Amino acid sequence: MQAGTILIVDDNKSVLTSLELLLEDEFEGVETASNPNSILSVLDSRPVDLVLLDMNFSAGVNTGNEGLFWLRRIREIAPELPVIMLTAYGDVELAVRALKGGAADFVLKPWDNDNLIGKIRAALHERKSSQLVHPVERPSEPAMII
């Protein structure tokens, strides 16, 4: 089992359940959210190492703009957090927009289990490597003048 907590955000309960069952045997923690409005509170309340984010949340909408909006919000508060976008309505242009927007990867539904797990592992590895090369700077305590 690999270290890491994955947050899955998708409005489809079947997708959430399928991904949770797949990933709970592979990673330390799996969190799910069916409403993207809960993303920020989840990220604020517990550590998350990667987000799997659906691109469409409203019925009849398949532009991917909702997912791109939430990707931007995640980037604002946690720029180092890898986000893998999920969609059933993918095309090259949408994938390019997601990757240019900061997504770590782009996965079409239905996904191949081994391929998805490999993409998650790669994104987690890249994040860990990046943290080793560029550690997060913590503010130093102010010097005391006596």
Can you name each region flagged by the protein language model?
Residues 60-79, 97:
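Short amphipathic alpha-helix used as the core "switch/output" element in two-component signaling
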Residues 38, 92-93, 107-120:
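C-terminal output helix
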Residues 32-50, 59:
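Acidic, metal-coordinating helix/loop segments flanking the phosphotransfer/catalytic sites
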Residues 135-146:
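AAA+ ATPase active-site-proximal loops
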Residues 121-135:
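The C-terminal output helix
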Residues 13-31:
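Two-component/phosphorelay signaling modules centered on CheY-like receiver
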